[in-house]
Swiss-Prot record:
It is found in: Lysosome membrane; Endosome membrane; Cell membrane. Residues 185-198 are cytoplasmic. The keyword Signal applies. GO terms for biological process: heterophilic cell-cell adhesion via plasma membrane cell adhesion molecules; muscle organ development. Residues 192-198 are annotated as: Required for endosomal and lysosomal localization. This is Sialomucin core protein 24. Residues 33-54 have a biased composition (Low complexity). It holds the Pfam family MGC-24. The chain crosses the membrane at residues 164-184. GO terms for cellular component: endosome; endosome membrane; lysosomal membrane; lysosome; plasma membrane. It comes from Bos taurus.
Amino acid sequence: MSGLSRPLLLAVGCLAALCVITAAGNTTLAPNVTTASSPPPTTTTVPVSPTTLSPLPVTTPAPDICGSRNSCVSCVDGNATCFWIECKGKSYCSDNSTAGDCKVVNTTGFCSVPTTTPTPTNSTAKTTTLPSTTTTSTTATTSGTTNTTLSPTIQPTRKSTFDAASFIGGIVLVLGVQAVIFFLYKFCKSKERNYHTL
């Protein structure tokens, strides 16, 4: 082999190895996200008196479904329009949130010791931001869609596979560059041989 072909052969081998390593390391997995189609949630700002610890949202009257509930958890957990009212030792579930000096509860976090086990329902989604004692307004976010459980789908782990197209493309690229270098070298050497000094 001539002096120039050995480095070129070494360069081809190195570039081929580099192509194989690059193709083997180029595996990316795209996350599979499942989203539920629902209307955007509505945000309502409701004034809160500074003496109460729970928000007093404005509600629309509902049929008498709140009166049949007998515990704080079952009252506020299953329905967005029901409120648990604790007033002077008497507690009851109502759809009217305006009670005089009574404590109005609309989240299970403010319920005192529950008397019965909550019955899970799937009627409406309800998210409420709890106010601090220094704020005078709170933001309640509710949407009219049903609760859905989204479980992410897990893609099986993909083993690194050899990408033949990338490998062949890399070889063609390297051989093309080497051919250009080879012909430039031959061209320069032929010009050098033609002009010998005497």
